[in-house]
Amino acid sequence: MKPISKTLKNGMRAIAVPTNGAASMTIMVFVRVGSRYETKDINGASHFIEHLMFKGTKRRPDTLNISKELDRYGAEYNAFTSKDMTAYYIKMDAAQTGLAVDLLHDMLFHSKYDPKEIERERNVILEEINMYEDNPRMHIEDLIEESLFPDSTLGWNIAGPREVIRTVPREKLIAYRDAYY
């Protein structure tokens, strides 16, 4: 199986790996954005944006609409953020590839960034930070990276510091998204 690669108008590169005869398919979009590309005033923005992508679009107004559409087909879907990338994926029946592509496109380019959802997600992310700090393995990894890269964004926490998560304005999140997506 030879990968097929195409560069889109916005500069993103799409790569497909055909799998003949498979009953399911996975579409995963990797965006070259993570905590290493952030500045101190928006540290955590990549991860914050990842959360907001699932909170509603112009055509799918809220989380429930997105999940109902995917759950109807037994889809598995999620996202993750690292130091140098953010990825979004959907795995589902291969016959529904068009839906998966349409939904990911809608989430990536037409998410609403509803102010109420942003406020709700602040608390979700703050709880996630608490969870990381309560997990010795995860917390030690963060402390090691902080020590190894003290003067670099590579030493920063992917989720960001609590103060930034509490206060980063919607406009800064949208500007950051517009710069990288």
Question: What feature does the model see in each segment?
Answer:
Residues 7, 18, 65-181:
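Charge-rich, well-structured scaffold segments of protease-associated domains
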Residues 21, 26-91:
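M16/MPP (pitrilysin/insulinase) zinc-metallopeptidase core fold and M16-derived inactive scaffolds
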Residues 1-24:
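N- or domain-start disorder-to-order transition segments that initiate the globular core
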Residues 4, 16, 35, 53, ...:
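A glycine- and charged-residue-rich anion-binding loop/surface
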Residues 12-14, 37-40, 48-53, 107, ...:
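A broad, low-specificity signal for short, low-complexity segments enriched in glycine/proline
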